[in-house]
Amino acid sequence: MLIKDIILTPMSLSAVAGLLPLLFVAFLVLHEPIWLLWYRYAARRHKCSMPRFIEKSFPLGIQRTMDMIKTAKSYTLLEVQYDRVFNKFKARTYLRQAPLQYQIFTIEPENIKTILATKFNDFGLGARFHTVGKVFGQGIFTLSGNGWKQSRSMLRPQFTKDQVCRIDQISSHAAELIKEMNRAMKVDQFIDVQHYFHKLTLDTATEFLFGESCESLNPENQSCIVARDGSEITAEQFVESYNFLLNYAFKRTLSSKVYWLFNSKEFRDHKKRAQSYIDYYVDKALYATSFAAENSIAEKDAAAESSGIYVFSLEMAKVTRDPVTIRDQIFNILIAGRDTTAATLSFAIHFLARNPDVFNKLREEVLDHFGTKEEQRPLSFELLKQAPYLKQVINEVLRLAPVLPLNFRTAVRDTTLPIGGGPEQKDPIFVPKGTAVYYSIYMVHRDIKYWGPDAHEFNPNRWENLKLDNVWAFLPFNGGPRICLGQQFALTELSLTLVRLLQEYSKIEMGPDFPESPRFSTTLTAQHAPPGVVVRFS
């Protein structure tokens, strides 16, 4: 009798089937201790110590992941994590169990510096390519290694000061913002300013990216684009799909190695609609640059420069003729150009409404530097930088409400972090290849070790003579080679919009049930949780 005949008998198959549940239970029980035993041995080989605390979550970290999703839905994720780190675990760097893997969590600036700068080549984006990249494409925020380097070299020339400091364009959109807010306040009195800030930043971002604004601040705008398949898509429909994709990408990120479970038909439909909308403008850019090549591209460039017009998609079409590459980069830039700035403006209004003394002091500086509503002085990038208290206020908003409160990198090789191991948390810790290292800028920015006992308080005056013990304790735009390319654009838009608002209004009133502290809704970026920032200007 052959061996295969023995193996394939009904009795043997039944025995194997009966063993499967036992094997699965054994895997659940033994996976964690075996991995930790190996990790302890590997750490000693690399002359590292074990982290002081290990957050276990049976089985396989699934319960902890479900808890994170639950707290994210209730808008308490960041607060719960803060309480765990500083009060429950009392560990600034620790191991935690996630589905099918262990992760490292840290709030140490020296570790963050190591990840983002000194050992930059030891870390990549890991699963982000699959969790987020499959949603928003292969762009600068989802690529690692050579792909990221190529994206960076392609995009860096597009973000020079002359190209991103678009004072006139931002000013015109800020004027439309104020008109629309005034119209809304005549009807409802109290309004959610975050809703209008998202429209503002969408309009400025699309004008920068496409050469024409979506005009979402214009209530009479009913325009739409015609996609390649002949379907019509409005700006409102695009935003609906875009917002869905942001939330979906965040769920895929939290799900760790089982991200592939999130692949619904609704997701695919929204992705197709959002891509089709951007493809319309990509096709226009490719056609325009192709036409220009046949009719003296030098003349067309000269005309564009003389009019002060800069269009991101047109410039990208001169660098690459691949429509998917252009679309993916636009998708990636839009995340930074729209959501982060709108969120920061919203948090700024929250803090100013809660702190009328700060509002009054800032308004006094604005009127002194930039003139009144009736006698506005011409704004410039240089003039905006000459308002010290405005800069202090923006820095304090970015400190307490960072738009990327939680981030991660994945080790591409066995490596180490300088501190976090041993009873005193001062020894190096081992990071195995493939391990995700999460870091929380939200917690670093609220750490009393660097910011003092009033770290949780909104106090722009702290920036007047501030000298941080560690410059990596303030990272509103990330750090190292992957530092945000568009930070100057964001700061210009933030500053100019606040100036125009404070020229227009002399008072902010808080709406009903206005929260004492901002409530964070966390997707790929942070924003104020519903019902938003409900105020009335006068």
Swiss-Prot record:
Where found in the cell? Membrane
Q: Which domain of life is it from?
A: Eukaryota
Question: What is the membrane topology here?
Answer: Single-pass membrane protein
Q: Name one GO cellular component term.
A: membrane
Please tell me where heme binds in this chain.
Answer: C484
Q: Does the UniProt entry include the keyword Nucleotide-binding?
A: no
Q: What is its EC number?
A: 1.14.14.80
Per its Swiss-Prot or TrEMBL entry, what cofactor is needed?
heme
Q: Name one Pfam family in it.
A: p450
What is this enzyme's class at the first EC digit? oxidoreductase
| Residues passing through the membrane, by range | 18-38
What is this protein's function? Catalyzes the first step of sophorolipid biosynthesis. Catalyzes the terminal (at the omega-position) or subterminal (at the omega(-1)-position) hydroxylation of a fatty acid. This converts the fatty acid to a substrate for the subsequent glycosyltransferase reactions.
According to UniProt, the name of this protein is: Cytochrome P450 52-M1
Q: Please report the organism this UniProt entry assigns to the protein.
A: Starmerella bombicola (Yeast)
Q: What gene name is given for the protein in this entry? A: cyp52M1
